[in-house]
Amino acid sequence: MRHYLLHGLTYLLALTSAALVATHVHAEDDGLEVRIGYLAWEPARGPLLSNVIPEPEDAGLRGAELAIIDSNSTGRFLKQSYALSAVRTGTPEALLTQARALHEQGIRLFVVNAPAKELLQLADAFPDSLLFNAGSASDELRGEQCRGNLLHSLPNRAMLADALAQFLATRRWQRWLLVTGETLDDLAYAAALHRSAGRFGAKIVEEKPWTFDNDQRRSAQAEMPLFTQASEYDVVLVADERGDFGEYLPYNTWYPRPVAGTQGLTPTGWHKTVETYGAAQLQKRFEALAGRWMNDRDFAAWIAVRSIASAVTRLKNADARAIRTLALSADLPLDGFKGRKLSYRDWDGQLRQPIPLVHPRALVSTSPQEGFLHPVSELDSLGFDRPESTCRQFAAAH
């Protein structure tokens, strides 16, 4: 408890000093200029065992750029302007060095697309700043490793797994065969699926680790049916975040069953096929800017910047502490083109949001599913609810 209180006091003192300096905002006669830092580093994925379509190298960055354009479009009427200082590095050490340089220039608002370890280093290095996590789905970042100055615009694995489990429950596909890869991310995704199975009454009839090191492009039709032999199941769930083998499970299972998880029917924060509630206009504007489809990291960066801009519009300043306080209140509903107002949970900083369930070229459904009720918000049926949260930094620093 003493450890959490010390973290909270350090955070509050740092933000108070930042409020006195507030060098990231230039209040001039002609308006307010808000500078936002974008920090990105992604470790090498290593050799893949399939020819999976790679993630765009500018994933996330283009979403932040579009949000700056959108914010300036509305901000000019209020004499507010927004500028993005983007940093993409090849090493985590360079990321911290470049972030320090932006911090020395007075920037106190950051959108970060980086793994959990680097996010924690940045959050601890800049306690007077407000960071938005737009790149890591780590459940630990929303739990015991949370930080009071770190909000999360990207859904975590628990939210994704719950969204999928709710849909499977509505279809009464409650017997799962779980196939898990060997990476730490795969194991974390599998752990989230185990948690969701317990929450929504599913049974994992068998869990099979994928330990093969061969390319499945030529042998999937022969090997996958034998590998997926097991007790009767309704659906095959796959935890393969890198894409080593999961793409070859659909249509190759022992029983003719659907595949879901990281491949097949996939829960995600955003997808090209999301078009309702004005989303089609956002998709078109993004494609005109980036020349490609908008993905979940692009949307996470976009909504993070829009969160800042929406708060600045209400506050008429860009103080990091004030933005955090407003974001965690009920007074900053955000329009994310998902059919519901989005908001940040005040117990762990996670953005509440509906989760699309998609396959590569179509939207299948959106969770939370009808009938999954909650006393406060149905969106809180996805992920860690207040009673089960292990995050203590927000209680100390709120």
Model-derived features with residue positions:
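Extracytosolic ligand-binding ectodomains
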Residues: 3-8, 23-398
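Bacterial N-terminal signal peptides
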Residues: 7-20
